[in-house]
Amino acid sequence: MESINESYDDSSSFGQDSLLYNRPFAYLYLSFHLKLLYSVPASYIAMIRAGSVGKKSTCEYTYWDDGVGEEVMGDDSWDYEGRKISHIYVAFDEVIMSIQFGFLENGALVLSKQHGGIEEGSNFRVVSFVSITIIYFCVCVRSGQVLFLMKFKRS
C-alpha cells in the first residue's frame, strides 16, 4: 500500500477543505474538513470551478455522444447555478471512474449528469455535505497516473 504524506501549505491551492484522489484509490479520511493527504506539486493542478457558478469548463476533451459512433469535441457545461450540492457519488476501481453530484430541491434528491463512466464491479462511495455551494474540480493525468482533486467551499 502506498504511503500517504501530509502536504499542507496555506499558500497552496489545496487548503483545509480539499479532497485528493490518487491512483490507486487510497485511504479516505472523512471528517467535516474532508481530505485525502498526498503530495502533488501545484504545477500539475489545473482547477475547474463547478457548483453555483454555472460556467463551462476550460479543458477540451473527446467524449462519445448518444448517437452510434459519434465522437464530439468540446467543453462540458457545469449547469449547477443556484443549487446547493448535498452529495457527491464517487465510483472507483483502481482509479476514479465517475463523479456525480446530488442536490436537495423541495426535499427531494436530484442528481446531476454523471461525469465519467462506470464499469461493472466498480466500488461506490457517497459523500454527504451540508451547505456546500462551490466545488473546484480538477482532473490531471501525469506519468500514467490519473489524479482527481475536489476543493469544497462552504456557504
UniProtKB/Swiss-Prot annotation:
The chain crosses the membrane at residues 26-48, 127-149. Residues 47-155 form the Jacalin-type lectin domain. It is a multi-pass membrane protein. GO terms for molecular function: carbohydrate binding. The keyword Transmembrane helix applies. Its main location: membrane. InterPro entries: Jacalin-like_lectin_dom, Jacalin-like_lectin_dom_sf. GO terms for cellular component: membrane. The keyword Transmembrane helix applies. Keywords: Lectin, Membrane, Transmembrane, Transmembrane helix. Disulfide bonds: none annotated. It is found in: Membrane. Belongs to the jacalin lectin family. This is Probable jacalin-related lectin 26. It comes from Arabidopsis thaliana.
